């Protein structure tokens, strides 16, 4: 049995989970609604305020899909009830971020400002001018947008300049030593 897959998912109050015969799962909650098509071989059942994921056999593919499906469902339930967020920090002289409507505009030392559009279901918040908070109900989208923003200026190892996640630790290098 998959260690992750065998754990049932508790459905919090205010969240409803429905599964169609084609394994399309709809999760509705206070923050919104998520719909995802799961693999047809995995069995998903909603039993008294919890979701149970089972697999038909011990074939390698089914074992892999068992834990994956359970993790995806759990992320959907957590997303519609609490939401997900990633915090990015801009480190560097003149590095700033500002919001223009739903668009994030950043000055990152290029000859032009960098603009990032908010994807559906993802919002930006600013904490000062050097902290960007990416929020949403879909963990995959939040992570992808945050990674896209970080890719504009990855942190460099000498001065730590660039865009980093707030919980990321940058391995620093020693500079050249003079004679």
From Swiss-Prot:
Domain of life: Bacteria
Keyword Ribonucleoprotein on entry: yes
Biological processes annotated in GO: cytoplasmic translation
Keyword field: Ribonucleoprotein, Ribosomal protein, RNA-binding, rRNA-binding
Keyword rRNA-binding: yes
GO-annotated cellular components: cytosolic large ribosomal subunit
InterPro entries: Ribosomal_uL6-like, Ribosomal_uL6-like_a/b-dom_sf, Ribosomal_uL6_a/b-dom, Ribosomal_uL6_bac-type, Ribosomal_uL6_CS
GO molecular function, a single term: structural constituent of ribosome
Subunit description: Part of the 50S ribosomal subunit.
Protein purpose: This protein binds to the 23S rRNA, and is important in its secondary structure. It is located near the subunit interface in the base of the L7/L12 stalk, and near the tRNA binding site of the peptidyltransferase center.
Family in the record: Belongs to the universal ribosomal protein uL6 family.
Protein name per Swiss-Prot or TrEMBL: Large ribosomal subunit protein uL6
């Amino acid at each position: 049995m998959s260690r992750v897959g065998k754990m049932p998912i508790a459905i919090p109050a205010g969240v409803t989970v429905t599964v169609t015969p084609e394994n399309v799962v709809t999760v509705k909650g206070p923050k919104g609604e998520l719909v995802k098509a799961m693999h047809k071989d995995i069995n998903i059942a909603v039993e008294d305020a919890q979701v149970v994921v089972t697999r038909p056999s011990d074939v390698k593919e089914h074992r892999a899909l068992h834990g994956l499906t359970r993790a995806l469902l759990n992320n959907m339930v957590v997303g519609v009830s609490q939401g997900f967020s990633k915090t990015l920090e801009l480190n560097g002289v003149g590095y700033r971020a500002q919001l223009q409507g739903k668009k994030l505009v950043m000055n990152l030392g290029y000859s032009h400002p960098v603009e990032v559009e908010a994807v559906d279901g993802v919002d930006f918040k600013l904490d000062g001018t050097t902290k960007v908070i990416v929020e949403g109900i879909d963990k995959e989208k939040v992570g992808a947008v945050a990674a896209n923003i970080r890719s504009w200026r990855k942190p460099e190892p000498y001065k730590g300049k660039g865009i980093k996640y707030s919980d990321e630790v940058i391995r620093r290098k020693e500079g050249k030593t003079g004679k």
